[in-house]
């Protein structure tokens, strides 16, 4: 402690203490689990939404609406979904109960806690990510698709053989942004679970 009158050099003692702490390895595993889940869901949904926008509509109003969740702070988004998914008064659980399904404590269940936190963050960021992918798709010249169609290529094949290879630089950037943001997750955990239940959501930032 440099603020103490008698500072004591501890060397690597703190790192040695971490190496012996089982919570450290738990936080490592939880963080990796969250990162993989968040990256997978967000990237797949972003590509799907971008492809649908490219194929069906390019409305400016829709693009603006997709950015709205991203403009909300992490704390507000976490609070909103915490209330919506509440076991007793949450509208989601009330709907599940009305159709004969069992209520689920999404943030308090050991199995559902991490997927639910990942869902909240995917909901907030997927619109922004999809617009980045959509912008990459917009840079592909139309004559490339026209030439492929003349050669007998289907839309599905053109997507995999033309679109995906040409947007790889954009996807690489998206992955960098998503991975960086995933490792920095804190607000959603602090607001909803505080690392529980039984440390199943205790990520690195909350360790």
Language-model segments: what does each one mean?
Residues 1-207:
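A structural signal for multi-pass alpha-helical bundles of membrane permease subunits
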């Amino acid at each position: 402690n440099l603020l103490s009158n008698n500072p004591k050099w501890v060397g690597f003692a703190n790192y040695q203490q971490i190496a012996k702490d089982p919570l450290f390895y738990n936080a490592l595993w939880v963080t990796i689990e969250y990162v993989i889940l968040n990256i997978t869901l967000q990237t797949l949904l972003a590509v799907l939404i971008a492809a649908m926008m490219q194929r069906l509509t390019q409305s400016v109003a829709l693009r603006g609406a997709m950015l709205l969740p991203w403009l909300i702070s992490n704390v507000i988004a976490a609070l909103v979904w915490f209330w919506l998914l509440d076991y007793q008064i949450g509208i989601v659980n009330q709907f599940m109960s009305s159709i004969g399904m069992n209520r689920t404590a999404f943030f308090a269940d050991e199995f559902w806690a991490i997927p639910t936190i990942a869902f909240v963050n995917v909901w907030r960021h997927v619109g922004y990510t999809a617009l980045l992918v959509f912008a990459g798709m917009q840079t592909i010249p139309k004559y490339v698709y026209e030439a492929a169609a003349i050669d007998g290529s289907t839309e599905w094949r053109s997507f995999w053989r033309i679109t995906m290879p040409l947007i790889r630089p954009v996807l690489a950037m998206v992955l960098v942004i998503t991975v960086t943001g995933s490792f920095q997750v804190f607000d959603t955990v602090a607001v909803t679970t505080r690392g529980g239940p039984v440390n199943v959501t205790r990520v690195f930032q909350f360790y």
